[in-house]
Amino acid sequence: MLPSALLRRPGLGRLVRQVRLYAEAAAAQAPAAGPGQMSFTFASPTQVFFNSANVRQVDVPTQTGAFGILAAHVPTLQVLRPGLVVVHAEDGTTSKYFVSSGSVTVNADSSVQLLAEEAVTLDMLDLGAAKANLEKAQSELLGAADEATRAEIQIRIEANEALVKALE
């Protein structure tokens, strides 16, 4: 089988090689940060946590799995799931935040934007309350009358499970 980069052009009777230039164009763009640096913006509707700050790494929970972002990461757009965002500063310190949902965009110029529906630092959360909310939601799920109610309760369960995991 021929590689997908080779296509037969109708009417020409010969093979033509197609070339992807995206990587070259992305590399030619001016970086948002210096070489080996990553510009990070992280905000919720009520608060800005980082605004174009240079960081070493960001770990994010997404619908397709958790992953770490470093400078020169492949461009991507992902939907966040409830979980822990860990920001590794250039000085070696880490900051941990719980996010409920949102999106993360990784650009070719090593800039990253994380927009969260809700986000709080871990020290603002109470493990006991998260466990109590989880137990309450699990018991409510057993008595849910319709599919819509079950779906809403399941979302609460997933969020509280992620909270408990982040705090333990």
From Swiss-Prot:
It is found in: Mitochondrion; Mitochondrion inner membrane. InterPro entries: ATP_F1_dsu/esu_C_sf, ATP_synth_F1_dsu/esu, ATP_synth_F1_dsu/esu_N, ATPD_C_metazoa, ATPsynth_dsu/esu_N. One of its GO terms (cellular component) is mitochondrial inner membrane. Residues 1-22 form a transit peptide. It comes from the Eukaryota. The modification N6-succinyllysine is found at residues 136, 165. Subunit delta, of the mitochondrial membrane ATP synthase complex (F(1)F(0) ATP synthase or Complex V) that produces ATP from ADP in the presence of a proton gradient across the membrane which is generated by electron transport complexes of the respiratory chain. ATP synthase complex consist of a soluble F(1) head domain - the catalytic core - and a membrane F(1) domain - the membrane proton channel. These two domains are linked by a central stalk rotating inside the F(1) region and a stationary peripheral stalk. Component of the ATP synthase complex composed at least of ATP5F1A/subunit alpha, ATP5F1B/subunit beta, ATP5MC1/subunit c (homooctomer), MT-ATP6/subunit a, MT-ATP8/subunit 8, ATP5ME/subunit e, ATP5MF/subunit f, ATP5MG/subunit g, ATP5MK/subunit k, ATP5MJ/subunit j, ATP5F1C/subunit gamma, ATP5F1D/subunit delta, ATP5F1E/subunit epsilon, ATP5PF/subunit F6, ATP5PB/subunit b, ATP5PD/subunit d, ATP5PO/subunit OSCP. This is ATP synthase F(1) complex subunit delta, mitochondrial. The gene is ATP5F1D.
